[in-house]
Swiss-Prot record:
Binding site for ATP: D189
Keywords from the UniProt entry: ATP-binding, Cytoplasm, Kinase, NAD, NADP, Nucleotide-binding, Transferase
Cofactor(s) of this protein: a divalent metal cation
pH effect on activity, per entry: Optimum pH is 6.5 in sodium-acetate at 50 degrees Celsius for poly(P)-dependent kinase activity and optimum pH is 8 in Tris-HCl at 50 degrees Celsius for ATP-dependent kinase activity.
Effect the entry attributes to changing G207A: Abolishes catalytic activity
Designated name of the protein: NAD kinase
Entry note: thermal dependence: Optimum temperature is 50 degrees Celsius.
Source species: Mycobacterium tuberculosis (strain ATCC 25618 / H37Rv)
Amino acid sequence: MTAHRSVLLVVHTGRDEATETARRVEKVLGDNKIALRVLSAEAVDRGSLHLAPDDMRAMGVEIEVVDADQHAADGCELVLVLGGDGTFLRAAELARNASIPVLGVNLGRIGFLAEAEAEAIDAVLEHVVAQDYRVEDRLTLDVVVRQGGRIVNRGWALNEVSLEKGPRLGVLGVVVEIDGRPVSAFGCDGVLVSTPTGSTAYAFSAGGPVLWPDLEAILVVPNNAHALFGRPMVTSPEATIAIEIEADGHDALVFCDGRREMLIPAGSRLEVTRCVTSVKWARLDSAPFTDRLVRKFRLPVTGWRGK
């Protein structure tokens, strides 16, 4: 007896291309007896540019509408994403909770995290139906806020942890510590702690290097630091990075992947380590990361002759 198959579809709704691509996903999965699960916030009445469950059921698609909570992807084999990097990061959280792969199809601008572009959706669906994809484990970060030695908040990140000063506030005074030893104290707009996956995102814009995603490391990037030694550092993946906020300064904020926000009171401490739970990444493209880097950033390679 064939096991019941189900895919969670996460879509950046509200645009024609997303709806058209989602309709194609619905038809192909339905034709192949693969059930579809969609998020309640993306499932509204007919006539909108969102997903319409009643229309799908009328076409013979088995569909379930669920809330976007920690159990949204339970029982699914894959999370399929139609959107840009922001949508992918939202979907990655759901996939991580269920320990299943996430596969991105780009409908945004750069879409660095996506595995394919929208025009390749038929080829993508062939791989999904055949379960023909590789799965990579991507390093994630565990984030802890301590105040007076007590944990007051915690979170996680796939791309980066961004410590930032509050809006319209002065320079943020911090001390950066690695593996229990102080490295540098300075004033800044913030500090980024990034994974290799996130090195092409905010950390790159802040002056950090690009790290190949199969490299196991943690990247620390001061953001507009007023310091002689305010340079990016690449640490061991097993390092503990701590950032202490000056006690006589002001509160700060931490953003995990630009989505989950935490308050960092003055005098408290932010600790970032490798998380034991990774994000499972479905890969279709066998091309090296170098090709993706050149393609997504449109890097000039004219004149290259090779061997």
